[in-house]
Swiss-Prot record:
The lineage of its organism: Bacteria, Pseudomonadati, Pseudomonadota, Gammaproteobacteria, Enterobacterales. It holds the Pfam family Fer4_8. Keywords: 4Fe-4S, Electron transport, Iron, Iron-sulfur, Metal-binding, Repeat, Transport. GO terms for biological process: lactate catabolic process. This is Uncharacterized electron transport protein YkgF. PANTHER family: LACTATE UTILIZATION PROTEIN B. The E.coli ykgEFG operon is a clear homolog of the B.subtilis lutABC operon, however it is not able of restoring L-lactate utilization to the B.subtilis mutant for lutABC operon. Thus, ykgEFG operon may contribute to lactate catabolism in E.coli, but under conditions other than those tested, or alternatively, the ykgEFG operon may be responsible for the catabolism of a metabolite other than (but perhaps related to) lactate in E.coli. The keyword Cell membrane does not apply. Belongs to the LutB/YkgF family. It comes from Escherichia coli (strain K12).
Length: 475
């Protein structure tokens, strides 16, 4: 499995999402609620722009010294009694995780929410080997039951309302209780606790790894990650190679930004720090700890003009403010990484063949630039993708032909002049009362809702020449 979540073509996906009123209402409500809470926390903290500057500096410093910090982290984890595996590709990562599971004769694995494990497709690899995988994040658990991919990096089931969730629980687990969040959460919690107690392995992601101590930081709202790391005898943490902080001082800044940007809170419900396996005399924690550090294309991104995207701390703030995401939801992007960050990172990790449309799923309003806690210039990176695709000839054939025609006309003044005159006359014929009977594909609806400027059949060149002559005459 790749980061691709749908084989449906982009235009069809967009149409399906726009025609889904439940999804659009759910996403709009979530954006409004999270956005309002975020603003309260930003105002409360104060000096927000300075905090953003500091967070961006920390992430830039790590990326510029990534080799040194990866080495330091590896040494510390090993000293703490853990095992470190550097995975160049997603296949390397899943192969190692499967080997650990098979060596432990694991029949069941419990997982906390992790984007990088979604990225490498670890669930499918383990399930194909006959190992049961249980997602323990509330949203991910519901989506797993419904065989539905996540649509947000923080709130995976943002596109579902409680009526749909109850239907899933009823059809998959026989739930007969009321349609209240409290009752449904209690029902799921009771189900998952049985899995926590019987699983041989717990798999988590890693929000940040501390190079100085070899510690892994897990940030959750439900506490399920603590259960995944304390009850099973083996804990496997999977992290993208860029998710490092030098010391706890830097993590303090990043967590401050993460919680406020992700859900509009001072802190998330649970912040868990893990430093190696259980020590002698301790009553909980895993007997064995593995840290899988995943590259999967990140080295190439680091060496490219898109390296700034690796600052990302997966807060989802860009999705929570994006007008395009509001209308098409996460599934419209066809990637586990949706929204503005997905429009940048999906083509880098998954290739332009599958994700060439995503850089165009953006109005370039720059709202994402203004909320990103680590100052990733997302709109500039999206434009950069468009430029790269144009240079590589990946854009639509019709667009390529139009650009060639424009370039040819622009380099032949006589032809350009004739074209401008013809266009001016055509505009005067087809625009009446601010409307035109012509249809222009995707922008037809946009044009119907707006009054077009009246045209008098005169090109700007001829108008300018006429007025210039008049000024000289009056001069």
């Amino acid at each position: 499995m790749s980061i691709k979540t749908s084989n449906t073509d982009f235009k069809t996906r967009i149409r399906q999402q726009i025609e889904d009123p439940i999804m659009r209402k759910a996403v709009a409500n979530a954006q409004q609620r999270i956005g309002a809470n975020r603003q309260k926390m930003v105002d409360e903290l104060g000096h927000w722009e300075e905090w953003r500057d500091r967070a961006a500096q920390i992430r830039d410093h790590v990326l510029s010294n990534l080799d040194a910090y990866l080495y330091q982290l590896s040494e510390k984890v090993t000293q703490n009694g853990g095992h470190v595996y550097f995975a160049r590709t997603k296949e390397d990562a899943t192969r190692y995780i499967l080997q650990v599971a098979q060596r432990k004769n694991a029949r069941k694995v419990v997982k906390s929410k992790s984007m990088v494990t979604e990225e490498i497709g670890v669930n499918h690899v383990l399930q194909d080997a006959g190992i049961q995988v249980i997602e323990t994040d509330l949203g991910e658990y519901i989506l797993q039951l419904d065989q539905d991919p996540p649509s947000h990096v923080v709130v995976p089931a943002i596109h579902k309302d409680r009526h749909q969730i109850r239907r899933v629980l009823h059809e998959r687990l026989g739930y007969e209780g009321p349609e209240t969040p409290e009752a449904m959460t209690l029902f799921i919690r009771q189900k998952i606790r049985e899995d926590f107690l019987s699983a041989e392995i717990g798999i988590t992601g890693c929000n940040f790894a501390v190079a100085e101590t070899g510690s892994v930081c897990l940030v959750t709202n439900e506490g399920n990650a603590r259960m995944c790391t304390t009850l099973p005898k083996t804990h496997i943490a999977v992290m993208g190679m860029e998710r490092i902080a030098p010391t706890f001082a830097e993590v303090d800044v990043l967590i401050t930004m993460l919680a406020r940007s992700a859900v509009g809170a001072r802190l998330t419900g649970y912040n868990t720090w893990l430093t190696g396996p259980r020590e002698a005399g301790h009553v909980d924690g895993p007997e064995e700890f593995h840290l899988v550090i995943v590259d999967n294309g990140r080295s190439e991104v680091l060496a490219s003009e898109f390296r700034d995207v690796l600052r990302c701390i997966r807060c989802g703030a860009c999705m929570n403010t994006c007008p395009a995401y509001r209308h098409i939801g996460g599934h419209g992007y066809g990637s586990i990484y949706p929204g503005p960050i997905g429009a940048v990172i999906s083509p880098l990790l998954g290739g332009y063949k599958d994700f060439k449309d995503l850089p165009y799923a953006c109005s370039l309003c720059t709202a994402c630039d203004n909320v990103c806690p680590v100052r990733i210039p997302l709109s500039k990176l999206i434009l950069r993708h468009r430029r790269v695709m144009a240079e590589k000839g990946i854009t639509a054939k019709a667009e390529q032909r139009a650009i060639k025609m424009f370039a040819y006309a622009n380099s032949h003044p006589g032809l350009w002049k004739v074209g401008m005159m013809a266009g001016a006359h055509a505009a005067s014929w087809f625009i009446n009362g601010g409307k035109t009977p012509l249809k222009f594909g995707a922008i037809s609806d946009w044009m119907e809702a707006r009054d077009l400027p009246e045209a008098d059949g005169e090109s700007f060149r001829s108008w300018f020449k006429k007025h210039q002559a008049q000024e000289k005459k009056n001069g």
